């Protein structure tokens, strides 16, 4: 699988320095799975953060692997701090900012049907084995999308020309 290698350059004493360069290998220590995500200011603090995929636990029968993205900020010494974690659905074009308390406690499952694609978030039980569904985000397309967007307890998140994004608390 493809990898992303990131160099982080800072100006120290009027010279550029790569703060994530390994003195042993001469290669960046910032190597992660490539997920079509690029460094950006994800939390609008004026500092560019680096995306770092972290595998999420999977269901026993789930074939697809899911990842949260930890967005890391770097100090001039090369030390990294996670400033935000997100879940990205690149196929449907959305992302969700994960509450900090969810980072090690969620499972994710995806599903697609006729003109709907959804991701369900589950909170892992205290026993570590059980899980309870807490949130579903769905992208709805097709001629009947307006009606399907208000089914049950769904509420709107965003509308585009051909897609309506909704969520429901479970």
Per-segment meaning from a language model:
Residues 1-2, 41-54:
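Acidic/hydrophobic-patterned starts of short beta strands in beta-sheet-rich repeat architectures
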Residues 99-156:
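Secretory pathway targeting signatures of secreted, lumenal, and periplasmic proteins
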């Amino acid at each position: 699988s493809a990898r992303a290698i990131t160099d982080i350059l800072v100006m120290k004493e009027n010279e550029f320095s790569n703060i994530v360069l390994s003195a042993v290998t001469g290669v960046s220590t910032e190597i992660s799975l490539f997920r079509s995500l690029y460094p950006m200011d994800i939390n609008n603090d004026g500092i560019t953060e680096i995306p770092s995929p972290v595998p999420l636990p999977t269901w026993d029968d789930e074939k697809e692997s899911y990842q949260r993205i930890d967005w890391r900020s770097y100090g001039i010494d090369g030390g990294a701090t996670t400033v935000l974690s997100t879940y990205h659905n690149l196929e449907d074009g959305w992302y969700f900012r994960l509450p900090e308390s969810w980072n090690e406690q969620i499972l994710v499952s995806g599903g697609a049907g006729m003109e709907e694609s959804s991701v369900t978030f589950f909170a892992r039980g205290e026993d570590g084995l059980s899980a309870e569904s807490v949130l579903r985000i769905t992208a709805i397309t097709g001629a009947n999308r307006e009606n399907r967007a208000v089914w049950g307890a769904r509420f709107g998140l965003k509308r585009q020309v051909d897609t309506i994004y909704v969520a429901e608390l479970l």
